[in-house]
Amino acid sequence: MPILDVEVVTRDVPLSVDTGALAHALGAALDSVPGSVWVRVRHLAAADYAENGDQPDPLPVFVRVIARSGDTGRWPQHARVIAAEVATAVRRPRERVHVIFEPDARGRVFFGDAPDSR
């Protein structure tokens, strides 16, 4: 189980993203069993995003990863493959995809009242 929340900052119309294809690509890239990678894509209007200085171009994409941390030494490798797959799916440069790993999800994610045991 990683859960990946992808937030795409957009200027106008929300970008069309094939979320299913992205989930499959991320699952393959992360060597995950089918059904264990979950992806949610949301859009954030550029008017609701700012950086100090000029507005960046192209606009950024943020990916929050909720997963069991396991070996945090693998995070750079995972960040690379996540950024590459997301960049392809949303048609943005990989450098504009920011991957953020949340704290270890062990004991924090439940299905109903049962903790995730995968």
PLM features: what roles do these ranges have?
Residues 1-118:
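Interaction-mediating elements
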